[in-house]
Amino acid sequence: MSSSRLIKCLSSNNYIVRSFSKSSIPTTPTPDFPGEYKEPIVKTQIPGPQSKALIERLNKLQDPRAAHFFADYANSRGNYISDVDGNILLDLYCQIASIPIGYNNPELIKAAKSDRWVSAIINRPSLGVLPPKDWPALIENSFMQVSPKGLNQVFTAMCGSCANECAYKAVFMHYQHVKRGGKPFTPEELSSCMKNQEPGSPSLSILSFKKGFHGRTFGTLSTTRSKAIHKLDIPAFDWPAATFPDLKYPLAEHAKENREIEDRCLQEVEQLIKTWHIPVAGIIVEPIQAEGGDNYATPYFFQGLRDITKKHGVSMIVDEVQTGMGATGKFWAHEHWNLTSPPDIVTFSKKMQAAGFYHNLDYRPSESYRNFNTWMGDPVRALELEVVIGEIKKNHLLDNVVITGNYLKDGLFDIAARYPGLIQNIRGEGTFLAIDFPTPAERDRVISHIRLLGVEMGGCGERSIRFRPMLVCQPSHINQFLNRFDQTMKELYKN
């Protein structure tokens, strides 16, 4: 069906989708989002004429080429995003996995009208120098309410990239502090660092994994290896990259083979730590390689990584920028691993609204101003996090994620069974799921088509579609998606 004919059918309510039985939709302890739309509404092409006009206007000022459409955030509700042309889409992409409790959440709106929020918005402080009087209490009531086990310190930052960048700095400073036995800096170190020379500027490295993504600042980009276009023309550090396990699915049918794959990857990590020509001070790993294609490893692999880092005195950074804040059914994805000792550093951003990293006192620099910037985060985002955490607890959103994720996964298997070889490698935890298509072109075709049916989605890796719904996404929303996904497959693959 052509896109113009599709829009015509949609607008005349003649477009019939396969109905996944509503009687089989599971219930969750989470209440419905107040004032939410009942279902997607598509009136125009996407992007529509008003979005196209704004894209053309923006093009005169900055690069708009990545824009899907222009959003009308005032008109968006809960799990549904509105565009400027009046289309209402079920949002399963959620600002690249960064919206936790819905558009225009009433509790956030209520909080934003308070004097605390107004003061934080109009009097933005340099938190490291002149923190507001309620900053310690705000940290206790937000960040420390969800701190990973074993980590009692938090460094606040502005985004996921700078959270990881500052985590690398913390690792390097810790490594050198241990190396010099806690002694003061030498005059030679102090003078040589001003020339970018050793010993003050030591030659150290961070080990990362192929297909990983950790940001686009200079240090993080040297550890990002998901897409060439991110790295082209940018100088990079000569840091090692290990192979991340490429598991075979279904996992239960390939347990022996996958264990061998993970063992080989662990051996490679240890060999790189022992032999890389630049000493490895730390490693960074995502619980799920999100941007790189939703690549998974089992708890066995991560337990092995922790053992290796402890054995060799190498810091372990877990990048929970995309996986944190409950999307896998646990607040932190690394909770699924059952580690014998916690990671040294856990970084966060996206759904947390705020950004930064958790650590313990060993990773606090020996002097002030060493890991520092003007803002050191934003109190408004901490205030937002405080509300979000309250909503997660009050509305049982982690339980909701597990129930909703299971329903989504079952529905994907149901549809995949009717299209052998097309929908591949259904995988994930909670609602943090992904599927593969045979080629990038097939994946992109599906995303474009289902958008015309009122579902906003995103890809990752070479040929994957990633599911990144909000924590307030319920089985009823997934039922709407499954109907439209099934119809998309029919339209594209069954004449």
Curated annotation (Swiss-Prot):
User: Catalysed reaction(s)?
Assistant: 4-aminobutanoate + 2-oxoglutarate = succinate semialdehyde + L-glutamate
Q: Which domain of life is it from?
A: Eukaryota
Q: Which GO terms label this protein's molecular function in UniProt?
A: 4-aminobutyrate:2-oxoglutarate transaminase activity; identical protein binding; pyridoxal phosphate binding
Q: Where does pyridoxal 5'-phosphate bind?
A: 160-161, 374
Give the keywords, sorted: Aminotransferase, Pyridoxal phosphate, Transferase
Cofactor(s) needed by this chain: pyridoxal 5'-phosphate
Gene Ontology biological-process annotations: gamma-aminobutyric acid catabolic process
- Please provide one cellular component term from the Gene Ontology annotations of this protein: mitochondrion
Sites of N6-(pyridoxal phosphate)lysine modification? 350
Stated EC number for the protein is 2.6.1.19
Query: According to its UniProt record, which protein family does this protein belong to?
Result: Belongs to the class-III pyridoxal-phosphate-dependent aminotransferase family.
Instruction: State what protein this is by name.
Output: 4-aminobutyrate aminotransferase
What is the organism of origin for this protein?
Dictyostelium discoideum (Social amoeba)
